Regions:
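ATP/NTP phosphate-donor binding region
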Residues: 1-91, 354
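Fold-independent oxyanion-binding glycine-rich loops
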Residues: 10-11, 17-18, 38-40, 68, ...
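A short, small-residue-rich loop immediately preceding and capping a beta-strand
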Residues: 84-124, 130-138, 280
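A glycine/threonine-rich phosphate-anchoring loop and its flanking beta-alpha core
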Residues: 112-213, 218-219, 316-321
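Short alpha-helical scaffolding segments that buttress acidic/His motifs in well-ordered protein cores
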Residues: 196-200, 258-266, 280, 300, ...
Length: 419
C-alpha cells in the first residue's frame, strides 16, 4: 500500500487554559474591525464581555451578532452579513459552539465573495481566500475551529448542507478548556458524542487509491496516515475523559482532555471526512429535532457494527486506544471497540435506539432514502451503501438490535473506491 498523508488546519492553534487571553493580540494582528458571531446564551455572560474587552483593548472595533441559532439556519448568513455591512469588518471572530464558528466561516465567505450562502454549497466552490476567521470554541465537540466546512440548515432541503473548502479553515483557533467548565452535562454529552463520532468515522473511513490529484479534487480524501494519527489521539483522550467531564463538570483535567480530543477530531475529519452515522443523522435530526451529537452518538455503534467486516484492524486499534488488552485477537478487539463505544455513550445518557429519539416507525425507509442523498458522506463509508443497506442500519438502530448487522468479513463488502 502506498502511503498518503493529507492534513489541513489553521495557521496557528493556541491550546491550553488561559489561551483566550491572547484573543486581542491575535485578532489585532489580522484586522482592526471585528465581526463577532455568538449565541444569546454566551453573549450574555461575563466571559463574553471580558473577551470583547480584550478585543477593544487591543484597538479592535467590535460589531456583535449574538443571535446564532443551533444548526445555523441559512438565512442567518445573510442576516449577519447585513448587520455588519456598515462596520465593514476585516476579521470575523466565532465564539461559542460549533454553530457560532460555522456561521463565522460562512459569513466570511459571503462578505468576501458576495452572493448567497447557497451559491457555495458543496465542495471546492469558494473561489479564493476569505476574510480571516478567529475561532474560540466554548464546547468540546464539533472541532469546527480547525475544519474546512460550515454546516447549515436550509428549509428548502431536508438534510443539512455544507460549504466545504480549505479557504474556510480559520486562520487561528484559540482552544481554552476553561471556557467549557460552564458546559452543562447534557451538552457535554452531546458534543462529546459528536467528537467521538468524528475520530471513529475518520479512522474507519474509506481509503482511496493514492494519486497526485486526490487532495486537490476533494476536500475530504478519506483516511490517511496523518489523519489516523490525530484520530487515535482523539479516541484515547475522549474515551478517558468524556464520562468524567459529564459527571464531574469541574474536573479541569477531563475538560482539557475533551477539548484536545475534540480538536484532534477536527483535524482528523477535516481531511478524512465522516461517513454513514452523519449521513443518517441528518434526516433523523430533521424529524426528531434532537441535537446532532445525540443522533450521531445513538447511531455510531450500529454503523461500526455494519462496517466491522471491512474494518477489523482499525476497530482493533481503536479498542487498544480505549484501553483494551493488547493480547486479545483482532476479532475480539473489534467487538470490544464497538461494545466500549456503546457503553461509554450510554454512560453519559445518549439514547441507544432511534425509537428513543422519537423517530416514527413509518419514517425508517424515508430516513434511508434521505441519508443516501448525502453523497459525500455515503461515498466516504468503508462499506458500500445503497438505500436498502441504509434502511437495514436504520431498522437495527430503531429496534436496538446490533446483532442484525453482524456478518463475517467478505471481500465484496468493502467499497470499490478503496479499502
Amino acid at each position: 500500500m502506498s502511503m498518503l498523508g493529507v492534513l489541513r488546519g489553521p495557521r496557528q492553534v493556541l491550546f491550553g487554559a488561559g489561551q483566550r487571553h491572547a484573543l486581542g493580540t491575535v485578532t489585532a494582528a489580522l484586522g482592526s474591525r471585528a465581526l463577532v458571531c455568538t449565541d444569546a446564551r454566551f453573549g450574555g455572560t461575563r466571559e463574553f464581555a471580558d473577551l470583547v474587552g480584550l478585543l477593544e483593548g487591543a484597538g479592535v472595533r467590535v460589531t456583535v451578532f449574538a443571535e446564532v441559532l443551533p444548526d445555523v439556519p441559512v438565512h442567518q448568513v445573510a442576516q449577519c452579513a447585513a448587520v455588519s455591512t456598515e462596520a465593514d469588518p476585516d476579521v470575523v471572530v466565532g465564539m461559542g459552539g460549533g454553530s457560532c464558528i460555522d456561521l463565522a466561516k460562512a459569513v466570511a465567505v459571503v462578505l468576501t465573495h458576495g452572493g448567497q450562502a447557497s451559491d457555495y454549497y458543496g465542495e471546492l466552490r469558494v473561489p479564493g481566500p476569505v476574510i480571516p476567521v478567529v475561532a474560540l470554541p466554548t464546547t468540546a465537540g464539533t472541532g469546527s475551529e480547525v475544519t474546512p466546512v460550515a454546516v447549515l440548515t436550509d428549509p428548502e432541503r431536508i438534510s443539512k448542507v455544507g460549504i466545504s473548502s480549505p479557504h474556510l479553515i480559520p486562520h487561528t483557533a484559540l482552544c481554552d478548556p476553561e471556557l467549557t467548565l460552564a458546559c452543562p452535562p447534557a451538552l457535554t454529552a452531546s458534543v462529546g458524542a459528536d467528537a467521538l463520532s468524528h475520530v471513529i468515522e475518520a479512522f474507519t473511513a474509506v481509503r482511496r487509491p493514492v494519486s497526485a490529484a486526490l487532495a486537490t479534487e476533494r476536500v475530504f480524501v478519506g483516511k490517511n496516515e496523518l489523519t489516523d494519527t490525530f484520530a487515535l489521539l482523539g479516541v484515547r483522550l475522549i474515551a478517558g475523559s468524556l464520562h468524567r467531564a459529564w459527571s464531574e463538570p469541574d474536573d479541569m483535567q477531563a475538560r482539557e482532555s475533551m477539548m484536545l480530543g475534540a480538536t484532534a477530531g477536527g483535524f482528523a475529519l477535516g481531511s478524512a471526512g465522516t461517513a454513514a452515522a452523519h449521513a443518517i443523522q441528518y434526516p433523523v435530526g430533521a424529524v426528531t429535532h434532537t441535537p446532532h451529537g445525540v443522533g450521531v452518538g445513538c447511531l455510531l455503534p450500529y454503523v461500526m457494527e455494519f462496517n466491522r467486516p471491512a474494518r477489523v484492524p482499525e476497530l482493533a486499534a481503536l479498542a487498544r486506544a480505549m484501553g483494551a488488552p493488547a493480547d486479545a485477537t483482532p476479532d475480539e478487539l473489534a467487538d470490544q471497540a464497538i461494545d466500549r463505544v456503546a457503553e461509554l455513550l450510554a454512560s453519559v445518557g445518549i439514547p441507544s435506539t432511534l425509537a428513543e429519539l422519537g423517530l416514527p416507525a413509518d419514517k425508517l425507509r424515508w430516513t434511508a432514502e434521505q441519508a443516501f442523498g448525502a453523497e459525500r458522506l455515503v461515498a466516504n463509508n468503508p462499506r458500500q451503501l445503497d438505500v436498502d443497506t441504509l434502511e437495514h442500519i436504520v431498522r437495527a438502530a430503531h429496534a436496538g438490535d446490533r446483532s442484525a448487522l453482524r456478518q463475517s468479513a467478505a471481500p465484496d463488502l468493502t467499497s470499490t473506491k478503496g479499502a
